[in-house]
């Protein structure tokens, strides 16, 4: 009797937990450009909108197009993937993890946190939606995830300054080889984009790679300034644990 040959490696379910107005969609583009990867774009968004009643751009479209039962969503996130797929890349918004949702499934994923200075996040967010809260930034939920599963933390500014080294580090974390295909992609929308893309993805649709980082401190006033200020301690807590490359 012949012995069985080597078994295919278990697919990597790489979950990147971001907040809004970050480079999360660009990072999804980067991974989708790999030949061995499939991606999913904010799979918990429809549940989040239905459960919270929040009025986001394209709310009705998102709910109609998505799955509103988070348990069914989770079943797909931890379930089988198509043959030949090495990486199942999951782009998540951390604030889509609502109170009362069982998070045990998160530990079955290979997790990463993607953070950005909340002053930049808030300034960008209020251009698309008039109001913003601390919860909307995803930072409270990212802090919870950091406490619960201790994932590595990437800061968007660091990634934009040195995309390739940070992508290599992320590939190492996922246990896959880096490929230069991750550094550039064709412009325009993709079938994998959520239906909300036309409200939020204009910059990504124009892009062909990671943008050059340009530091800036937006001038915020009123409630937006207060939200950003309240978020800063949460951001700093995560920022001090971020991946720092030595070379």
Ranges and model annotations:
Residues 59-115:
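A basic- and aromatic-enriched beta-loop-alpha substructure that forms the phosphate/nucleotide-
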Residues 83, 145-151, 234-237, 241:
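A structural motif corresponding to the C-terminal end of an alpha-helix
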Residues 1-83:
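PAPS-dependent sulfotransferase catalytic core
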Residues 16, 20, 135, 159, ...:
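Aromatic-acidic/polar surface patches that form glycan- and anion
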Residues 90-181, 198-206:
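PAPS-dependent sulfotransferase catalytic domain
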Residues 47-49, 121, 188:
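Generic structural signal for helix capping and beta-alpha/helix-loop junctions
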Residues 65-73, 93-94, 134-141, 223-230:
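Soluble or luminal CAZymes and related metallo-dependent hydrolases
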Residues 1-14, 179-247:
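PAPS-dependent sulfotransferases, especially Golgi type II membrane carbohydrate sulfotransferases
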């Amino acid at each position: 009797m012949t012995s069985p040959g080597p078994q295919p490696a278990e697919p990597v379910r790489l979950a990147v937990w971001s907040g809004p107005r970050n480079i999360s969609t660009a990072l999804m583009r980067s991974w989708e450009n790999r030949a061995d990867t499939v991606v999913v774009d904010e799979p918990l968004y429809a549940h989040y909108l239905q459960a919270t009643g929040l009025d986001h751009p394209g709310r009705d479209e998102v709910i109609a197009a998505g799955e509103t039962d988070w348990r069914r969503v989770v079943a797909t996130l931890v379930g089988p993937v198509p043959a030949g797929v090495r990486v199942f890349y999951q782009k998540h918004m951390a604030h889509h993890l609502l109170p009362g949702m069982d998070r045990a499934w998160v530990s079955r994923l290979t997790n990463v946190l993607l953070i950005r200075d909340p002053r930049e996040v808030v300034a960008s967010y209020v251009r698309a939606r008039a109001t913003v809260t601390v919860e909307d930034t995803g930072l409270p939920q990212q802090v919870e995830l950091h406490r619960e599963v201790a994932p590595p933390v990437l800061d968007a500014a660091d990634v934009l300054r040195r995309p390739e080294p940070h992508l290599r580090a992320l590939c190492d974390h996922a246990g896959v080889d880096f490929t230069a295909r991750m550094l550039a992609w064709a412009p325009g929308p993709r079938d994998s984009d959520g239906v909300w893309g036309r409200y939020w993805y204009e910059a990504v649709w124009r892009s062909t790679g990671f943008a050059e980082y340009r530091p800036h401190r937006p001038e915020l006033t009123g409630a937006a300034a207060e939200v950003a200020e309240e978020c800063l301690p949460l951001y700093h807590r995560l920022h001090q644990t971020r991946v720092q490359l030595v070379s």
